[in-house]
């Protein structure tokens, strides 16, 4: 997957880069695997903003993804690699031998015509899914479950990869993309390989309008607000923030402040914190 730059016909175009999408083999999605997707604009069920800077963007349809990979013993053939507007990774359309079609997160290197399987003792091959206890130490994995049978929740973004570091009783040690080493139940499933679209991190948005296409709204500086709106607000001209250090809009320290709750139940599963 390459990255394409443009001739500088405008200031926004000068900075912009896009993926070449060489891996994509199919433009239209599988209709049977689509669902409607309504925009939430960062609001919860009470209508209050819980995630700032969200809203607008191009209309999308949700692609139903198989995160569980529970179709054991039935081989599936990769029919297409597709773009998914709802995630940074590409998705693969799988045609199973019994006639069923499913989408999975496409691993890097998976091609049309490849065979993928899931089960207890399938081959250690890119795209195959099996329990962590049956995966050799040192293997690169993604789409990792936290609870057996719930479906993959970890390491699903473009280019992400985790590594199985050790096995210890009912748990395995997984090194996450953040550097954190975590204990995960050995019965949880993971998929072999690294997530596709590894060049995603190198793409430059280039202009404000492209962020708006993605549903990302502007981020206003606190110092540009009034005192009622932000701790940094107010003052004449470019006034200092008036505090020992920068604060969040809610008055909490913005830098160096630990935001993880103390005594969290999952603390015992963290062997080494992220860097």
UniProtKB/Swiss-Prot annotation:
Going by the entry's taxonomy, the superkingdom of the source organism is recorded as Bacteria
Q: Which UniProt keywords apply?
A: Ribonucleoprotein, Ribosomal protein, RNA-binding, rRNA-binding
State where composition is biased (Basic and acidic residues). Answer: 264-275
A Gene Ontology annotation in the biological process aspect, one of them, is: cytoplasmic translation
Could you state a single Gene Ontology molecular function term? structural constituent of ribosome
Per its UniProt record, what SUPFAM superfamilies does this chain match?
Nucleic acid-binding proteins, Translation proteins SH3-like domain
> Keyword Cell membrane: yes or no?
no
Q: Where is this region: Disordered?
A: 224-275
GO cellular component terms given for this protein: large ribosomal subunit
Q: Does the keyword DNA repair apply?
A: no
What PROSITE patterns does the record tag this protein with? RIBOSOMAL_L2
Subunit record text: Part of the 50S ribosomal subunit. Forms a bridge to the 30S subunit in the 70S ribosome.
The Swiss-Prot or TrEMBL record describes its family as follows:
Belongs to the universal ribosomal protein uL2 family.
UniProt function note = One of the primary rRNA binding proteins. Required for association of the 30S and 50S subunits to form the 70S ribosome, for tRNA binding and peptide bond formation. It has been suggested to have peptidyltransferase activity; this is somewhat controversial. Makes several contacts with the 16S rRNA in the 70S ribosome.
Q: What is this protein called?
A: Large ribosomal subunit protein uL2
UniProt source species: Caldanaerobacter subterraneus subsp. tengcongensis (strain DSM 15242 / JCM 11007 / NBRC 100824 / MB4) (Thermoanaerobacter tengcongensis)
Its taxonomic placement starts with: Bacteria, Bacillati, Bacillota, Clostridia, Thermoanaerobacterales
